Amino acid sequence: MPIRCLALLLPLLLGSTSTLAGNAWSAIAYPLSGSPQVIGSYTAGCVAGAGALPLVGEGHQVMRPSRNRYYGHPKLIALVERMGRETAARGGRLLIGDLAQPRGGPMPSGHRSHQSGLDVDIWFLQQPRDRILSRAETEQIEMPSMVRATEGALNASRWSPRYRDALKLAALSPEVERIFVNAIIKQALCQSETDRAWLNKVRPWWGHDSHFHVRLACPRDSALCQPQKPIPPGDGCDADLVNWVRDIRQAALSPKPYRRPEPPSADRLPAACNAVLNSPTAWKR
């Protein structure tokens, strides 16, 4: 091969994450073996040594498995499995949305976070403990919204105390750093709970009306993991929450044309993610 051509190909052979961009991460078939390590932040990071959540387990079932987004740090896998067991003991089965890709990194659609193996989406909708959905059902069933956004109120006909129990179970887990829910759901919890201390971890955010997003804190043995700012003290049932609900209601009453967000770029990933991305036996296509 002429030297000039080799020089042109060299950047590709080196495999920088900026060159390969986000879609390269979604083409990886397997986690990187070895001790678990979280690198970077929730929105610009990757994970080595991830585990795969079983598609069906005691009290849980993975939804949209064709996306291949059911991987996470072993602490995240353990949390989901424990929540599943406790939900099964109450007669239910959790439906699990996206965790991370096999080695984390940016996804081509759906999320800006979920990059470091510490995030999981859990549907509010549950199934009876003994019902296992077919593969077609896991790909096709839609997540029902639990709010009436134009009214700024919870949809009481869909909401169940079981959903509150799942939220509280996650919030009381010490490894959980925060949980994102729609502000209308948090407002309803602020009104219904007598002991609101656990609501500190439950944070209002856009969307999240059909699922809640659980985020773990950085593991102590992952020195390259970048944490978020700590949550302010208090239960969060305050004027700021009122403003959140007002803004969500106004947005629903006067909707703007939907603009699909650009997929997150790989340019912001830490340099250490290069080795995670480019190690052998990674590619499925």
Segment roles from a protein language model:
Residues 32-97, 158-169, 173-176:
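Active-site acidic/histidine clusters and adjacent loop/turn architecture
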Residues 26-28, 136-285:
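Catalytic cores and adjacent binding grooves of peptidoglycan-active enzymes
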Residues 25-26, 30-33, 79-109, 180-201:
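Extended, low-complexity, intrinsically disordered C-terminal regulatory tails
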Residues 89-91, 115-119, 209-211:
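Extracytoplasmic
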Residues 101-156, 214:
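Acidic/His-rich structured neighborhood in mature extracellular/periplasmic domains
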Residues 7-16:
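Bacterial N-terminal signal peptides
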Residues 69, 100-105, 126-131, 184-188, ...:
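Solvent-exposed loop/turn segments at secondary-structure junctions
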Residues 17-21:
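Sec/Tat signal peptide C-region and signal peptidase I cleavage site
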